[in-house]
Every structure is written in C-alpha cells, then in structure tokens.
Amino acid sequence: MVFAGGGLQQGSLEENIDVEHIASMSLFSDFFSYVSSTVGSWSVHSIQPLKRLTSKKRVSESAAVQCISAEVQRNSSTQGTAEALAESVVKPTRRRSSQWKKSTHPLSEVAVHNKPSDCWIVVKNKVYDVSNFADEHPGGSVISTYFGRDGTDVFSSFHAASTWKILQDFYIGDVERVEPTPELLKDFREMRALFLREQLFKSSKLYYVMKLLTNVAIFAASIAIICWSKTISAVLASACMMALCFQQCGWLSHDFLHNQVFETRWLNEVVGYVIGNAVLGFSTGWWKEKHNLHHAAPNECDQTYQPIDEDIDTLPLIAWSKDILATVENKTFLRILQYQHLFFMGLLFFARGSWLFWSWRYTSTAVLSPVDRLLEKGTVLFHYFWFVGTACYLLPGWKPLVWMAVTELMSGMLLGFVFVLSHNGMEVYNSSKEFVSAQIVSTRDIKGNIFNDWFTGGLNRQIEHHLFPTMPRHNLNKIAPRVEVFCKKHGLVYEDVSIATGTCKVLKALKEVAEAAAEQHATTS
C-alpha cells in the first residue's frame, strides 16, 4: 500500500510495483542534449537512429505511457488519500471497448505487433495497443524501442502517476500465460520498493537551492574578473569560469528535466527550460528526445550494428566497437579511424559547438506546434543575446571573440569529458536486453567523493542513475553499495573506478578499435 507521503507499507511486491509512483515519482521528461550524450551528435548520421526505428515525426516533450495493474483495485487495505489516488489512477478516462475486456494474448502474438503502425506493449502483464498513440507520444520515438515487448520496468522507471491513467485507454487484454518473473527482475523490483519506503526518491530542496546559489556565484565570479581587468589573462580566467558555470548548470538542468527536484512536472519543466535553453543555449526538446532514447537503449545497435543510441553514432570520426567498425567501407574513413585514440580528447573541445548546431537545427526543422517552436527558438535566441551582449559590452576590441571562443571550447571539454566516462568503452550490443541488464552492462561508475560528486554533477553514479533516473543525485551514493551487491548476485559487472582509470579504459577501447581499423584498411587497399 502507498501513503501520500510516498512510503510503502505492508502489501505484496506486485502491489508495491503497481502503485509505487503514485506518491513518490515524477514524470520522466529528461533534459536537453549534453548530459549523458557524448560526441554522438557530430556524425551526419546522428539523426538516423530515430528514422530507422519509426520514421515518425518528432515531438518536443517527454511524457509517455504507463499503466497500473487491475489488482490495485482489489487492494482493500488501502486507505485515506492513497486509496482515492489509487482509484483515480486505475479508473479509465474513456470507456474501453467491451470486446477487449476479457481477451488474452500470448507473448508470441504481442511480438508480432512491433511496427509503428501496429504496435503493442506489455506493462505488468497487461497488453496495450498504442498504434494510434505512438505518433503522438510526447517522449518521441523512444517508445518504439519497446514495440512488441514487455516494457514494465522501463515504464516504471520513467513515468509519473499521472501517466498510469493514460494507458487504460489502450488496454486490450492480458498476457495469456504469465511466465514466472526472472530472479533478476524480481530482486530489482524489490530493491526499488525498498528505496521508495526509505523516501530516497524525494529531493532535498535545500540541496538544490545551494546548487543554484553555487552556480550563480561561479557566474558572478566570471563577470567580476573581466569587470576588474581587461588583460588577456583575465579574459582567459573569466572564460574558464564561465565554462565551469555552463558545465554545472548543465548538471542542474539535467536534474530538473529528469523530474528529480519537484513533485510537479511543470515546475521541473519551467526551470529546465530556463537553465537549458536560456542560460546554455541548448534545445530542451531536442535533448529530451535524444536522451530518452539513450536511457531506453544505452549503447544498443540494430542487427546490422547501426547505432540506435545516438550517443554512439559517431562515425566517421569515432567507432566505439569492432562491430560498428565492420560497417565502414570507405577507405578514407578507415584511415581516419586508425588514429581515433590520438585525437579523441581534442574533439571534446568542439562538442558544445556540435550540440548548439543540432539544437538550432531542431528548433528550425522539427515538427513542432507554433507555440513550442516559439518557446524553443525564443529561449535559445535569448541565450545568444545575453552571451554575445555581455562579451561585447564588457570587453574591448577583439577580446569578446577570445572570451566567447574559450568559453565554448572549455565548456565542451568539461561536459564531454564526463559523458565519455559513463558509457564509452563499455559493452556495445545488438540484441534486445531487458531493461536492468541493458543499463548495467553499458554503464560505468566513477567512485564517489566530494570532488567527483561535484565535478560530474552526480553522474559519476551513472549505473544508479540509469536504473533510477528520477532519484535525486544526492541519494545516489546512498544506494550504490546495495546496487553493487545486486549486480554481484546476478553475475553483472559493476564497474566502479577512478577518473584516471576510467579515462584509460576509454582510450584503451578506442585504441583497440583503431588497430582493427588499420587492419581493415590494409585488407581493403
């Protein structure tokens, strides 16, 4: 049973999983393009994975679909506020066709319905036909990664109580023969229920106030330096401080757009847009679609090793696995890839420029409503107005160009360096893994300490973040030991290393693929 405060009391595991988000989790909408994306946007192919998946039009917000099991309606022990809330969640908003009320469908039948025009999804052993919804899905085409599949855990991780009502309109029956829940998923759901009982999905508002004030202080320090001195050393110091401010604001926006801070979705969205678009110049809509897909399919490729996760779609400059490399036939590209481990770190300086380009392209070409387009483009333009205006007003001659260029280059490095530690050099796969395993095998943690937690914005606990994306960052270190025990129990590698070791692992993986590129180039010459 769930109480309004967010805690779980006695009741079956299935009850807990069904209603766990009612009081404690907010809607997973996701932040804009830089946190947890790597240099994936650099490739001219970086918009192709979504086209390969659905060829559906883009949308600008993330909301998606979830359902709650009918057994909650039979939970006679639920009382007070929780009872009313649970009833409101399970009650459909529109009448379902009576012909579907008692129908059953084998999983083999569900698997056939995996196309954009004919798509079914299973959540908690209930079958939903979302064929008429997929094109309107606020989270974008990420929903297509679970067409014809069981999406219970990914939905539970990403969505708020309000979305549980939505799927009732698409309910068409139950799974014909329910298979026993695998031990790994059973343990994962029990662990999640435990974290809910411990209130670990509730944020500390004071923590985020302090983070906001810290970022304001860094911004003020950057401006104060060039107000005090116009020397080139002062300009460079100020630019580096502004780059650090951009990095830290990126982490903060990421938290808000993962709905980690407020229980109310629109408050998270407002703050996310202000920081993401207006302060940083990134399109929040573009990032959310990209980041949603990354969370649903981290390091995943299709059967021909064309990346589904845009974060690893970095050809022709970078290949993250030998299987991806095998898809390259162009000799010029192979010649470049032979040296990827040597120039990779240098590329990170240009990462922010790439993200700004794709953000602006999204505001101009994506299928958006007039209001959404005005919001996206207007807030991004405001970023350029204050950024360029500040530089030109405070600095003379050619120094504004130096200040802006160094800010952009350094912020790209500061953000990109953290991103690559999280997933690059980890497993790249082309088979559909269940949600939990997919997150762990593709993800690396960086050890927690005061500096790492601050510098990475909590993304050093990337495994925990991917398993529980709506959990506030200040609680991720608390759950890390239990997640590690869970991984060891089920034979999953829990990689938790220092920044130096993580960097070496990334470069080693790049070098191994580079050597394979040299061999492949030699055989095709």
Curated annotation (Swiss-Prot):
InterPro entries: Cyt_B5-like_heme/steroid-bd, Cyt_B5-like_heme/steroid_sf, FA_desaturase_dom, Fatty_acid_desaturase. The chain crosses the membrane at residues 216-236, 266-286, 340-360, 378-398, 401-421. Keywords: Fatty acid biosynthesis, Fatty acid metabolism, Heme, Iron, Lipid biosynthesis, Lipid metabolism, Membrane, Metal-binding, Oxidoreductase, Transmembrane, Transmembrane helix. The lineage of its organism: Eukaryota, Viridiplantae, Streptophyta, Embryophyta, Bryophyta. Disruption phenotype: Increased content in linoleic acid and disappearance of gamma-linolenic and arachidonic acid. A motif (Histidine box-3) lies at residues 462-466. GO terms for biological process: lipid metabolic process; unsaturated fatty acid biosynthetic process. A motif (Histidine box-1) lies at residues 254-258. The gene is DES6. It is a multi-pass membrane protein. Fatty acid desaturase able to introduce a delta(6)-double bond into delta(9)-unsaturated fatty-acid substrates. Can use both linoleic acid (18:2(9Z,12Z)) and alpha-linolenic acid (18:3(9Z,12Z,15Z)) as substrates. Required for the biosynthesis of arachidonic acid (20:4(5z,8Z,11Z,14Z)). This is Acyl-lipid (9-3)-desaturase. The histidine box domains may contain the active site and/or be involved in metal ion binding. It comes from the Eukaryota. GO terms for cellular component: membrane. Pathway: Lipid metabolism; polyunsaturated fatty acid biosynthesis. It catalyses: (9Z,12Z,15Z)-octadecatrienoyl-containing glycerolipid + 2 Fe(II)-[cytochrome b5] + O2 + 2 H(+) = (6Z,9Z,12Z,15Z)-octadecatetraenoyl-containing glycerolipid + 2 Fe(III)-[cytochrome b5] + 2 H2O; a (9Z,12Z)-octadecadienoyl-containing glycerolipid + 2 Fe(II)-[cytochrome b5] + O2 + 2 H(+) = (6Z,9Z,12Z)-octadecatrienoyl-containing glycerolipid + 2 Fe(III)-[cytochrome b5] + 2 H2O. It holds the Pfam family Cyt-b5. A motif (Histidine box-2) lies at residues 291-295. Its EC number is 1.14.19.47.
